[in-house]
Amino acid sequence: MISMANILFTEDHEWINVENGVATVGITIHAQEQLGDLVFVELPEVGRTVAKGDGVVVVESVKAASDVYAPVDGEVVEVNDAVASDPSLINQAAEGEGWLFKLKLADEGQLTGLLDKAGYEKLIG
């Protein structure tokens, strides 16, 4: 189970939860509400090195396709195959069981530029 107590957010509507140098990443509830029912998810390969801002995942809904960006630099160490098989998991639990991938952080200092829950709620109004 993902602890949402220390969750951080990006302005691109990703969430990140870091435990022991590994970041779990997904899209926010707000993002999945804007996209609507998800029908396809393209996950990255484990072992891929990504830089902050790189498009890492593609999510497709009946409305649109959207990239999910890396919130920090790191190496993909795990992907959530369950969401590739059943994208509706993201609609059901975007900030929980609908997580997308996990990154081994390259620089924890990059976390300081992310938003806390109050900052994100202010962003989305």
Curated annotation (Swiss-Prot):
The glycine cleavage system is composed of four proteins: P, T, L and H. Gene3D superfamilies: 2.40.50.100. SUPFAM superfamilies: Single hybrid motif. PROSITE patterns: BIOTINYL_LIPOYL (PS50968), LIPOYL (PS00189). Keywords: Lipoyl. Binds 1 lipoyl cofactor covalently. It comes from the Bacteria. Signal peptide: none annotated. The keyword Transmembrane helix does not apply. GO terms for cellular component: cytosol; glycine cleavage complex. Pfam families: GCV_H. The glycine cleavage system catalyzes the degradation of glycine. The H protein shuttles the methylamine group of glycine from the P protein to the T protein. Belongs to the GcvH family. Residues 22-104 form the Lipoyl-binding domain. This is Glycine cleavage system H protein. One of its GO terms (biological process) is glycine decarboxylation via glycine cleavage system. InterPro entries: 2-oxoA_DH_lipoyl-BS (IPR003016), Biotin_lipoyl (IPR000089), GCV_H (IPR002930), GCV_H/Fam206 (IPR033753), GCV_H_sub (IPR017453), Single_hybrid_motif (IPR011053). The modification N6-lipoyllysine is found at K63.
